[in-house]
Structures are given as C-alpha cells and as structure tokens.
Swiss-Prot record:
Family as reported in the entry's similarity comment: Belongs to the 'phage' integrase family. XerS subfamily.
Keyword Cytoplasm included in the entry's annotation: yes
Name of the protein in question: Tyrosine recombinase XerS
Lineage: Bacteria, Bacillati, Bacillota, Bacilli, Lactobacillales
Organism: Streptococcus thermophilus (strain CNRZ 1066)
Molecular function GO labels: DNA binding; tyrosine-based site-specific recombinase activity
PANTHER family found in the cross-reference section: PHAGE INTEGRASE-RELATED, TYROSINE RECOMBINASE XERC
Activity regulation (UniProt): FtsK is required for recombination.
Amino acid sequence: MKRELLLEKIEEYKSLMPWFVLEYYQSKLSVPYSFTTLYEYLKEYKRFFNWLIDSGISDADDIASIHIKTLENLTKKDMESFVLYLRERPSLNTYSKKQGVSQTTINRTLSALSSLYKYLTEEVEGPDGEPYFYRNVMKKISTKKKKETLAARAENIKQKLFLGDETMKFLDYVENEYEVKLSNRAKSSFYKNKERDLAIIALLLSSGVRLSEAVNLDLKDINLKRMVIDVTRKGGQRDSVNMASFARPYLENYLSIRNKRYKAEKQDVALFLTEYRGVPNRIDASSIEKMVAKYSQDFKIRVTPHKLRHTLATRLYDATKSQVLVSHQLGHASTQVTDLYTHIVNDEQKNALDNL
C-alpha cells in the first residue's frame, strides 16, 4: 500500500477508536513502530471492539465510547470466546468455503491485543504516575504456533531462495533477459526503472537488510567506497551494514542516473525514488514487493524481499559457518533466530547419510 493511502487509512481507523487507543498509537509512534504495523494493529482493534459490542460485553453505542474498564474487567473466558469466534466465524472471502480465519491471523490479533494491554497495564503513566490498571488478561492467553520443525521449515524456504550462482543469475536475468518478452509499451516502463530496480535487488541480496530498512535509506546513508549502508533497525537503533561487492556496479549505475531520471532536487534525500508527473517521491514498500515478485516469478519462483534477506543469510552462513556473524549482519541480538540457516545448509548431513 502506498504511504499516502496507508496514512489515510490510519486516520480513518483512528477516528473510530477510544481515547486510550489513540494514546497507545501516539506512544508507539515514538518507539518507533512502523506505520504498516500500526495500521495492522488498528484493524485488529476494530475487529475486537466490534465483537465486544456485538457480544454484549460492552454496552457502548460505538467503538469510540468503549470504556477502559471493559478491558480491565475482561475475563479469560471472555478472551477464549473471542478466539473461538475468530476460529468459527464465516469467512469474508466469497471464494473460500473455509470457516474462520487462519491461525496466523489469530496470532496476529492476539499479538496486537497483548501490545495494547501491556501499554495499559505497564507502560503508561496516569496522573498518579501509575498504569491505568494492572490486570492483564492477555498474559493468560496462549498462542498456538504452527507445528513445524526447523528442518521442515528450512526445506520449504530453500525452494524460494536464490543460492549459489543463482544470486548473480537472477540479477543477470533482470538486466539482460527479462525485457525480451515485453511489449514495446512494457519495455518503456521497464527501461525507466531498470537501473533503480537492479540496484534495489542487488542491495537486498548483498546486505540482507529488511524491506523497511531499504525503503528508509537516504543518500547520506550509503558509502560505496566502503560498501557500507547505515540503517535504522527495529526499535530505532542505528546500525552499519556491510554489502557484498557484487552490488557496487548496480548501485553506481543507479546513482549516475538518479537525479536526471527522477527529477531529483537537493531536498529529495531518499536513496530510492519513484517519479509521477514530474514529482519525485521515496519509493514505498508495496512497490518494491510488487517489483521483486514480478521479476522473481518470471525468473524462477515468486518470492518476497524477505526471501532475498534469507538468501543472503544462507549464503553467508554457508561461506562462514558462523551464526554469530550472520546474526550481526541481519541485526539480530541473538543467534537463535539464525538456527534456521544451519538447517538450510545441510549438505554435510546429506553426504553423511549417502555414505552409510
């Protein structure tokens, strides 16, 4: 979703919310939570508050009128009834006969509610310096995680990674082969953004940064001489991230045409730009997701920018066998998250089995 539309939707949801959710929203902006995360959370709150009214737990006439005492007094049984409602309610998708929402959606809903309850019971300070209330019913509600071993998850992800020489083959395909099947009209659009698209893909594949980190890069954040970018990690921490040298020519090509192609002026500080009717803007996450999906599907298999992050992490682990190094590259505080890559790179285990 484009940033302008996203902010418009956020304002629409905010206009429906009770005062304590608006306080929560303002607080999380300072963390900072991304607008995308806050948008998803507001959607979940609307769903939950509508249920409170429809089920008779709240006698409010509308969402904005829901009293904070209603949240304080919710019982474990109430929350379990809400989860059951999510599991069994008719699907809103007219093309599906499946009842209820997925476990992933339920987990996201519970995560959003846990965040709100933590704010209300621990983080906020009322006039007396204390939280609004102390009873956090969400601590009694557990989420059901998908049962899947790391090995099974790794095998599933592995099919969607561009490992070995496929990293460079993918870039070469976008640069030299993708355009062959395009119409003249499609070629015109492709040529306009070719250098930029290649630079973005190369940056993701060479650094493993998150999509949001790439989107928020400014010109001042990139040092091609040292092949380093400065990014804002989750939680607002600044970090310097190394890039593999294969990305340099793609980034140099883009920077050489950036100002003229996208009509960039001094005030246009964003690294990656899009241009519409002569006005340059920072490219948004949705545009990059669509771009990566388009090229990757034509090359081999449709993937997301996050799979390009997995690609870099897997290749780096394969080359170094160091989970610490990989976790530092990805911006993780713990090596636990990188356990996945040890299972993707499991040739030694397979070779041992072959020798039995």
